[in-house]
Design a protein with these regions (language model features):
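Catalytic phosphate/metal-binding cores of nucleic-acid and nucleotide-processing enzymes, i.e., regions
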Residues: 1-104
Length: 104
C-alpha cells in the first residue's frame, strides 16, 4: 500500500500502467461503488494510467472494477469513463483478463 494518501495519489503501486484505487468500507452499495469509480478514473487521468478499483465491504470478498473497453477491438480512445462501461469481478479474474493487455 502506498504510504502517501493525498488526493490524486495511487493507493497501491507496483502494477505498471495501472492507477489503483482501493476502498474498504462497511457497505458497498452500487451508488457508492460508482462514486469510487469516478475517483479512480480521475486519478488515472492525472497519472496517465489505466483505472482500476479494488473494494471490499465488511464480510464480503474483494471486488475489482475496470474498463470494459480494454477488451474491445479496436480499443476506444479515450476509454469511456462511466461506471456503466465497466466490468466487475474478483481479483484473480481481473488479473487473468488484463495481464496480457498493452497499456495504450
Amino acid at each position: 500500500r502506498s504510504v502517501r494518501q493525498h488526493d490524486g495519489d495511487d493507493d497501491l503501486v507496483g502494477v505498471p500502467g495501472w492507477s489503483i484505487e482501493a476502498k474498504r468500507y462497511k457497505a458497498a452499495p452500487p451508488a457508492l461503488v460508482a462514486q469510487w469509480w469516478g475517483q479512480a478514473v480521475e486519478q488515472s487521468r492525472r497519472t496517465n494510467a489505466l483505472p482500476v478499483l479494488f473494494y471490499r465491504a465488511d464480510r464480503a470478498d474483494w471486488r475489482v472494477v475496470w474498463p470494459a473497453g480494454l477488451h474491445q477491438s479496436p480499443r476506444p480512445q479515450p476509454l469511456p469513463p462511466g461506471f456503466v462501461d465497466t466490468l466487475t469481478g474478483d481479483p484473480l479474474t481481473w488479473w487473468r483478463m488484463v495481464r496480457g493487455l498493452a497499456p495504450s
